[in-house]
Amino acid sequence: RDRLLAGAMLPASTYVQAQRFRRWFREQVHAAFEQVDVLIAPSVMCEAPLLDNPTIMVGGKPASARANLGLYTQPLSLPGLPVLCLPLSNTGTLPLGLQLVAAPGREAALFSLARKLEQAGLAGRYPHNMQQAA
């Protein structure tokens, strides 16, 4: 709710400037797909925090989990790209994940790579009681 209120308070000129930046950023990111089929990026900078802990460490300092957990996912959502996030296997911690990013219309490439990563044992995490069933 607080983010919606903050957005509603933006002046029109700021909104127009943000849309210009979004178009420019979209062009830059789409150009990357002339060289590669899929981009791979971390989903978050650290393991997931416990529900009762509202902070994470950012640059060695405690910071708001809510304000900082989306730092790696939000920029890739801005240009409207298809993104698939998947958990890494056997990290020994709370979930860590990867983002697989493709050009619009190339969602099949994301699913194909995710399946290969899972088959190689690099991705895919199951609750303890489901591990034998998988």
Protein language model features and the residues they cover:
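Structural helix-boundary/capping segments
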Residues: 15-19, 27-30, 35, 77-134
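Serine-dependent amide/ester hydrolase catalytic core
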Residues: 1-78, 128-133
